[in-house]
Structures are given as C-alpha cells and as structure tokens.
C-alpha cells in the first residue's frame, strides 16, 4: 500500500484554553509544594508540559515534542542507575553493562571501558536537558513550567536527605532548560546558581548568578553572590556584594535601589581567576551549615508581573508571568 500522510481534520485547541490548563496545573503545583507533596507537584508540572507539547505537535503537524519529553523523563530516571551503582561500589555492573539495559542511547556507541558512572550520568542529564528544550520548542510558557518542576526537585532536596544530591542535579537540569528557553527569567537563573552552590560548582554558580543580577538586580541575588564570593575567598567581591545588599536596605532606596551598573567584563573582573582543577578558597564550607546566615538565600517567587497572554497563529512567542504570587514560603 502506498504511504499516506495523515493530517489533522479538526482545528487545534486554542491557546487561551492551553493557557487556562497550564495556569490551573501550576496553581495546583504551587499548592502541593506548600504541603511538601513534591512528587504530586512534579506530576502536575509534567502533565502541564505534556499538554503544551501536544498543542505544539498539532500545530506543527508532527510528533516530536511529546516524544522528546518522554525521552527526557526516561533519561533522568536511568541516570539514577549510575548513582546507585556508585553507592553499591559497582555491584550493579560496569558503566557499559548499565548502558546496555537502558532505553537512552546517548552513550551506546561509545567505548565506556574507562568511563565512570558519574560521568555517564552527566551525559544523561545533558541529554535530558536538551530534550526538554526540544519539548517546548523555545516556547516561553515552557520555561515557566520547567521552572515549576525544578522547584519540586529543590523542595524535595529539603525533605529527602537520601536523594539530596540527585534532587540538586535534577533541579539544575530543569532550571538550566528554563533559562535556555527564556534568558530573561531571573528566578530560574538565581535558583540555578543556588542549586549549583549546594553542589559546590562555584564557577558555574557564578555565571548563573551574575547573569541573574545583570538581568534584574535584587537583594536575594546579591546575598547569593555574597555567599559565592565568601567561599571563593574573594574579599573585594564580597565587599562589592555587601554594598549592593546595603543599597537595597537603606531607607532612601525604598522606591528604586541605587544599584551600581557594571558591564559583564567589569563584573567578572572583580572575581578571582581560579586555575582549572584548583580548589577555591573555603570551598569546603557545607551548604547545610547550622549557621543560617551564611547559607545562600533561595528566592521562591518570580520577578515577572502577571501579563495578558495573547494567542498567535503559528509559533507563539508569549510573555511569561504565571508565577507572580506562586512559590513563596
């Protein structure tokens, strides 16, 4: 039989309806996170992402977005096998043996003889991040949903000590994907830096936090930068951060904080140059310190105001704003 192309015979669901469903799911996600129901909150986020993916697939006349979401979910689940292998001293099999049992084929064509489980897991998470971006087709609504799912992992890290590192790493995947889709999403950049600080990946944390501060300065981001530079032992940068924090707290700056404007090059010049592989000063400080004042501060809201989301005929480019009053402790 000759192959035939199947086309849609009904008009696709309108963007207003898609928006309404996403708002409902994000609100339920927020309510569940307030009750520390992280898994249920995450499921709401994933289902919202699936609804967006299906709407995009129908409009594009293909089937790429939803399968990409499924591939991302599977890759993150399978990445845990490498973590479990490391915790069991490799008793679950070698890296190549573990990869052979997986659906994710990102490493299947490589010689994995000398590849550690942790490195393999890194590639799985990178693959998942790219598939999440493919799922949304760079749709800004997707960035909001990815941010919410990242929040579920961040909250999980606060309640489940056994899975703390995996929760940090998965939160990084979703925050990073959200930021790639919408570079102006300040909260995603700040939370990405916050999670990277927990993993002591200070150079990457600096990139995220500097980007967040340059996008929209806030006292929360300045506090995170203060903690970052404290760990690096960078006294001049700590002094700069302290001045920025003070500028938000002075009575004269209640309306508009007096924040010094720096170019990216000027900003980075105040940071230390750390050679590759050289540990930063004070990098052994634990995030989970009992001294709460020295911890990085997490921001649980969005800086974006709620906006009216108008539909577009083909590839929409909507403003974000689902999180105006959500995700606040």
Q: Language-model features: where?
A:
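Alpha-solenoid helical repeat scaffolds
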Residues: 59-61, 147-148, 187-191, 220-226, ...
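Short coil turns that delineate tetratricopeptide repeat
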Residues: 46, 53, 140, 183, ...
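Structural signature of tandem alpha-helical TPR/SEL1-like repeats
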Residues: 122-130, 162-177, 199-210, 234-242
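Residue at a conserved register position within TPR or TPR-like alpha-solenoid repeats
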Residues: 32, 153-156, 160, 196, ...
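Alpha-helical solenoid repeat scaffolds, predominantly canonical TPR units
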Residues: 25, 32, 44, 51, ...
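Amphipathic alpha-helical repeat scaffolds of TPR domains
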Residues: 20-27, 49, 55-115, 126-129, ...
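Alpha-helical linker/edge segments of TPR/alpha-solenoid repeat scaffolds
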Residues: 2-8, 67-107, 232-242, 250-255, ...
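Canonical positions in the second alpha-helix
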Residues: 48, 135, 177-178, 211-212, ...
């Amino acid at each position: 039989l000759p192959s035939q192309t199947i086309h849609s015979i009904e008009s696709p669901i309108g963007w207003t309806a898609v928006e309404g469903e996403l708002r409902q799911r994000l609100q339920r996600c927020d309510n569940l996170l307030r009750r520390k129901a992280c898994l249920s909150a995450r499921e709401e986020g994933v289902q919202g992402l699936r609804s967006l993916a299906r709407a995009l697939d129908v409009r594009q006349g293909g089937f790429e977005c939803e399968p990409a979401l499924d591939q991302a979910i599977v890759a993150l689940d399978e990445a845990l096998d490498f973590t479990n292998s490391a915790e069991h001293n490799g008793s679950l099999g070698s890296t190549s043996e573990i990869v052979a049992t997986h659906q994710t084929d990102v490493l299947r064509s490589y010689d994995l003889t000398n590849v550690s489980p942790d490195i393999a897991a890194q590639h799985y998470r990178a693959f998942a991040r790219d598939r999440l971006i493919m799922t949304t087709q760079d749709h800004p609504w997707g960035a909001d949903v990815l941010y919410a799912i990242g929040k579920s992992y961040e909250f999980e890290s606060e309640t489940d000590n056994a899975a703390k590192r995996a929760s940090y790493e998965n939160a990084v995947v979703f925050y990073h994907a959200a930021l790639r889709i919408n570079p102006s999403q300040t909260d995603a950049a700040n939370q990405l830096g916050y999670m990277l600080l927990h993993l002591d990946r200070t150079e990457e944390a600096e990139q995220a936090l500097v980007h967040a501060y340059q996008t929209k300065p806030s006292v929360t981001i300045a506090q995170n930068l203060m903690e970052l530079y404290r760990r690096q032992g960078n006294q001049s940068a700590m002094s700069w951060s302290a001045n920025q924090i003070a500028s938000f707290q002075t009575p004269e700056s209640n309306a508009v904080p007096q924040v010094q404007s720096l170019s990216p090059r000027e900003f980075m010049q105040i940071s230390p140059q750390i050679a590759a592989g050289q540990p930063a000063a004070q990098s052994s400080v634990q995030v989970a310190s009992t001294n709460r004042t020295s911890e990085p501060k997490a921001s649980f809201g969005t800086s974006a105001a709620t906006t009216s989301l108008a539909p577009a005929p083909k590839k929409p480019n909507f403003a974000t704003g689902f999180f105006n009053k959500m995700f606040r402790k």
